[in-house]
Swiss-Prot record:
Originating gene: HSL7
Enzyme class: transferase
Keyword S-adenosyl-L-methionine part of the UniProt annotation: yes
EC identifiers of the protein: 2.1.1.320
Molecular function via GO: histone arginine N-methyltransferase activity; histone methyltransferase activity; protein-arginine omega-N monomethyltransferase activity; protein-arginine omega-N symmetric methyltransferase activity
Record PTM: Phosphorylated in a cell cycle-dependent manner.
Protein name (record): Protein arginine N-methyltransferase HSL7
Keywords per UniProt: Cell cycle, Cell division, Methyltransferase, Mitosis, Phosphoprotein, S-adenosyl-L-methionine, Transferase
Residues the entry annotates as binding S-adenosyl-L-methionine: Y345, K354, Y355, E414, D441, M442
GO cellular component: cellular bud neck; cellular bud neck septin collar; cellular bud neck septin ring; cytoplasm; cytosol; nucleus; outer plaque of spindle pole body
């Protein structure tokens, strides 16, 4: 199995040695002789400090020029002495073991400067470096994050201008990856929010990715899940986050082992342009003398970890099957109106787990029906939508097992003329022509015949379920069978099926649809496209059961009333801020008795739809919640996503109200889905002047005062306490029991790791660009966040003022796919 995860190193060397003359790093061993050659990439700066000095002098000259002799700023391209990566032997074609390069773009630039000339200088330097990288065949470049977040929009503007330049987007496109810590203790989603702001400014550009510096402390599960759905191209692993085991070898703590395994499991799905994920080690030379094995021990450990992860994933047959196919977004199938291809049937028939479950259901159903079967009055079994006959095969197997060959009559109905030919061949070769084949649409079968001439069936078996359960018209198709061909004791397999939705963040899904101009109002089937479910629960939206009507309560078949149209209002509570790109859909089905299949994610908490059955139950709320899992190793269905035309952002402790409708129109002869969204927050307000209320409702999230409190407070993960988040995953299971003796160095934050990657701890900022000595990355800047009006303090107000809970609407979407204008299913 190929995991698409590679290993890179940033060699330890002194940048100053390149400032006077060229000293190319033709191999890392010349600078780190302790390193073995078992790595795939070398991370090096594109240019040397010498180039920085040249550019600085050019900028000084530009600032000194007079108005009369003014000329636009011209930044020279780097010369031979100004580059770290040689213009030759970047990739030796005759030696696949030679590592490739990942480039570091200049980190001394101030892309967010308020001085337009400084920003212009930065952009021109980046374009020069990108031009050289393209020439020597480097396609992945890592960029330093902004230094001052109060000017983040200026930074994003320059990044987008860089991405829009032909030097970057011309095929094969370059990948620009912004380096950031995976999370901060004080605000775990702060770096994700930074990334999301820049990414949105750049309109989800496919060439923009993220490189994450692994933390030293355990990552909260909701933060990790958010990043797993993002286009992460590099994991930056500092030697400072390693511990030493009982043998003094460097090892990662178990939570970081699992973190890497989870990214390994994503398996390159997040790489839109096919760029593989790379784990980059850096700072190994700092602590080489403190561990056994020196620098090479770090590299050998990471390689061991990835190989172990490959074995774990390779042992999962379902994961192996998924790896055989590329990630893709597909329109839902319409088997009722379109004829499926032979290759589609073949793919579905490979899912032995599904057919094993069907076989078990058929066995139990025939055992229940057996007492009324005889040679004079054989049981009639209908396989509705037989396709190429896999369910007929399983039915014959059960009949032989129960010795009911003479007591059963089998009918297979299929409208696809090509599949019908296949059934004819199977009937002759395998079924001894004992199956009655009917080439017709099941919704029209014998509907014009007198009732006494219609075939009545005892068992109806079908596999008409789509990714959302009802989205391939199973209710409509089986209703025709029920109405015209069933009696009171007819058994249907499946007996019922439910549809479920949950709000998700899936930036790659949104990016792919946006870049290909595909409809954001139509539902899509997603295969191996990462997503993050934002709510704590998945909601059941509706359920269909068969039989759909009780015949013994109806005198005339024309009196049957069945609700094919369904609507559901769903409430979701979302604890952590984020952005919604749509709703993901799953289904579960009860085939017969206690035999179920499910496409819900493992360990899902499901809120069942409120029904009349629960109305009289005094403990109905408890009975509406249950745990569900995905049927192990079942591969027939991928999830369906109902997208939003515009992503919607929300803050911590938000509530969503989602309308999901299934519309069946006999007038227009089609079925379609419509959906929309509203978001809310709850505020706890004191009942005093409206001016104070209005002011308190506009306080930014990051400003917390004594006068403003939300109903549910933000809960931050803190490294200074031993508190663990309630919903945090315990990642310590199923990992080798390694005794860790402690960290190798003093505490190093994720931001320091990012600075180390870019060499910012060694070089000072040029004084001609900014004379103010401020931090490299100022995450605590709140210039733009200070409230303009000071609120009155509680001591100035009346005591014991009653509090009011206010539900405030924060956003609303349009109604999507109105009247089926983007997607519908013909009846």
């Amino acid at each position: 199995m190929h995991s698409n995860v590679f290993v890179g190193v940033k060699p330890g060397f002194n940048h100053k040695q390149h400032s006077k003359k060229s000293r190319f790093l033709e191999n890392v061993s010349s600078h780190s002789p302790e390193l073995p050659s078992n790595y795939d990439y070398v991370l090096l700066p594109i240019t040397t400090p010498r180039y920085k000095e040249i550019v600085g002098q050019v900028f000084k000259d530009f600032q000194r020029q007079s108005i009369q002799n003014w000329k636009p700023l011209q930044i020279p391209e780097p010369q031979l002495q100004d580059i770290c990566i040689p213009p030759f032997n970047v990739k030796k074609l005759d030696n696949d073991d030679t590592p490739s390069y990942i480039g570091l773009l200049s980190s001394w630039l101030e892309l967010e400067s308020r001085d337009p000339n400084v920003r212009d200088l930065g952009l021109k330097v980046l374009l020069n470096e990108c031009k050289y990288a393209r020439f020597v065949g480097i396609n992945k470049l890592i960029l330093a994050p902004p230094r001052d977040l109060s000017n983040l929009q200026l930074y994003g503007q320059m990044i987008y201008r860089l991405l829009q330049n032909r030097i970057v987007f011309a095929a094969p496109a370059l990948t620009i990856s912004i380096s950031l810590p995976l999370y901060e203790d004080s605000d775990p989603l702060a770096t994700w929010e930074l990334w999301n702001t820049v990414r949105k400014q750049c309109e989800y550009h496919p060439s923009l990715t993220i490189s994450l510096a692994l933390p030293r402390t355990r990552t909260p599960s909701y933060v990790l899940n958010r990043w797993l759905a993002e286009p992460v191209s590099c994991l930056l692993v500092s030697s400072s986050i390693f511990a030493s085991n009982q043998y003094d070898y460097p090892v990662l703590h178990k939570f970081n082992q699992n973190l890497i395994l989870k990214f390994q499991k994503v398996n390159g799905d997040s790489q839109i342009l096919g760029n593989e994920l790379c784990v980059i080690l850096h700072g190994m030379e700092k602590y080489a003398n403190n561990v056994k094995g020196g620098e090479s021990a770090y590299l050998e450990y990471i390689n061991y970890l990835l190989k172990k992860g490959d074995k774990v994933l390779n042992s999962n047959s379902n994961h192996q099957f998924l790896l055989q196919e590329d990630s893709r977004i597909m329109p839902p199938l319409k088997p009722h109106s379109d004829n499926l291809l032979n290759s589609t049937y073949l793919t579905f028939e490979k899912d032995l787990v599904k057919y094993d479950l069907y076989e078990s259901a058929i066995l139990e159903a025939l055992q229940d029906l057996a007492p009324r079967a005889s040679a004079k009055r054989p049981l009639v079994i209908l396989v509705a939508g037989a396709g190429r006959g896999p369910l007929v095969d399983r039915t014959f197997k059960i009949i032989s097992m129960l010795f009911m060959d003479s007591k059963v009559s089998i009918i297979a109905i299929e409208k696809n003329p090509q599949a019908y030919l296949y059934l004819q061949k199977r009937n002759f070769d395998c079924w001894d022509n004992r199956v009655k084949l009917i080439k017709e649409d099941m919704t029209k079968w014998q509907i014009n015949e007198p009732s006494e001439k219609r075939i009545q069936i005892d068992l109806c078996i079908s596999e008409l379920l789509g990714s959302f359960g009802c989205n391939e018209l199973s209710p409509e198709c089986l209703w025709s069978i029920e109405k015209y061909h069933s009696h009171n004791d007819t058994i249907f397999i499946p007996r019922s099926y439910s549809s479920y939705i949950a709000p998700i963040s899936s930036p790659l899904f949104y990016q792919k649809l946006s870049q290909t101009n595909r409809s954001l109002e139509a539902p899509w089937i997603v295969h191996r496209v990462p997503y993050c479910i934002l709510s704590s629960r998945v909601n059941e939206v509706w359920r269909f059961e068969h039989p759909m009507a009780q015949k013994d309560t109806v005198q005339d078949e024309d009196d049957f009333t069945v609700e094919f149209s369904q609507s559901s209002l769903n409430e979701f509570k979302i604890k952590h801020r984020g952005e919604i790109h749509g709703f993901i859909g799953f289904f579960s089905a009860n085939l017969y008795n206690n035999i179920f299949l499910s496409t819900l994610p493992n360990d899902s908490t499901v809120r069942l739809k409120f029904s009349e059955e629960t109305l009289m139950n005094t403990r109905r709320e408890e009975n509406l919640i249950k745990k569900c899992d995905h049927t192990p190793n079942m591969t027939s269905w991928s999830p369906i996503i109902f997208p939003l035309k515009q992503p919607i952002s929300f803050i911590d402790d938000s509530e969503l109200s989602v309308l999901m409708s299934r519309i069946h129109s006999d007038t227009e002869q089609k079925v379609w889905y419509e959906w929309s969204l509203e978001s809310f927050i709850y505020l706890m307000l004191s009942n005093y002047t409206s001016a104070v209320t209005a002011a308190s409702m506009t306080i930014p999230r990051s400003i917390v005062t004594d006068d403003t409190k939300t109903l549910a407070h933000n809960r931050h993960y803190s490294a200074t306490t031993n508190q663990k988040l309630d919903n945090q995953i315990d990642l310590d299971q199923d990992i080798e029991n390694e005794e860790e003796q402690g960290f190798l160095s003093n505490l190093e934050t994720g931001w320091q790791s990012v600075q180390d990657i870019h060499g910012l701890s060694e070089t000072a900022k040029p004084d001609h660009l900014d004379s103010i000595n401020k931090p490299m990355f100022d995450l605590k800047s709140t210039k733009a966040l200070e409230p303009s009006n000071e609120l009155p303090r509680h001591e100035d107000l009346e005591e014991d003022v009653p509090e009011v809970h206010v539900r405030v609407k924060t956003s609303v979407s349009t109604l999507h796919n109105v009247c089926g204008r983007a997607f519908s299913l013909p009846l």
